[in-house]
Amino acid sequence: MSGQGKRLMVMAGGTGGHVFPGLAVAHHLMAQGWQVRWLGTADRMEADLVPKHGIEIDFIRISGLRGKGIKALIAAPLRIFNAWRQARAIMKAYKPDVVLGMGGYVSGPGGLAAWSLGIPVVLHEQNGIAGLTNKWLAKIATKVMQAFPGAFPNAEVVGNPVRTDVLALPLPQQRLAGREGPVRVLVVGGSQGARILNQTMPQVAAKLGDSVTIWHQSGKGSQQSVEQAYAEAGQPQHKVTEFIDDMAAAYAWADVVVCRSGALTVSEIAAAGLPALFVPFQHKDRQQYWNALPLEKAGAAKIIEQPQLSVDAVANTLAGWSRETLLTMAERARAASIPDATERVANEVSRVARA
């Protein structure tokens, strides 16, 4: 499907969960001849990341309102109006055929600006429960898509765009059948780490002994303390790294993952075809719980919510999964994934632009 001469503006910012899926769709459409620009904020990760991908970025000034106090709330309408005006000027100059909102604060004023100029708005909600910005924008959007069922009552479920190196991994049957020895447990806390996993997993390792080998991603600044915790638990052999640059290689190595359940993490684990023990971050709206629930329902994962998390709960869960069980769960995870999510989102953008 050629997009020769068509123009897209992607609105996404703040976290990797918004920015990476946006980049996947942008690259897919650029390969079809689309011109793509980005709308973001200058003080968040998109400011550095997007230009590295060869995409020009425009900035508006906007930030979140949660927990900002009464003064910020009083000033909010003026700040939103100014951000809307900035976005409108940017879009008037660029003249996109369609805008794609992938979440983050920037999508709110950006979506309103597009709508006020008669530019179609396409939305993609990455999480199992819709964010505030997308709830508002859904009322004016031409098309709304969701990664998981339940964020919006009638939106099409298209999955989350996932990195191509994860999609290219061999299927679970090819990867896991015939594996022997200790079960390989990948612990992922995200770039900031997950303190609860850093505290719990060394004790889990002590309980499980030689039956597991662990690769633990501790997050920024925590590697030494986590290594020390494993050593003090009599388990110094396990590997601890601050970050994992090649997640596809880590997924290929693993038999099972213990992690938070951010939207992109859940989608990557499903695409990789891996069983998981999810410990959702305690958001007020239980966003990460709803992200993980479809995989638990599919028999591919177990959720332990943080108040119920203990060394015994994790150790008993992992010890209760035989290699046969892990392979079955891995196959169910892969079956529940939507590997062509990038194409599905890109196709809707193209369809709306042609309408």
Curated annotation (Swiss-Prot):
It is an enzyme of class 2 (transferase). Changing residue 15 to A: 387-fold decrease in kcat. Disruption phenotype: Inactivation of the gene rapidly inhibits peptidoglycan synthesis in exponentially growing cells. Cell wall formation. Catalyzes the transfer of a GlcNAc subunit on undecaprenyl-pyrophosphoryl-MurNAc-pentapeptide (lipid intermediate I) to form undecaprenyl-pyrophosphoryl-MurNAc-(pentapeptide)GlcNAc (lipid intermediate II). Strongly prefers UDP to CDP, GDP, ADP and TDP. Belongs to the glycosyltransferase 28 family. MurG subfamily. Homodimer. Associates with MreB and MraY. This is UDP-N-acetylglucosamine--N-acetylmuramyl-(pentapeptide) pyrophosphoryl-undecaprenol N-acetylglucosamine transferase. It comes from Escherichia coli (strain K12).
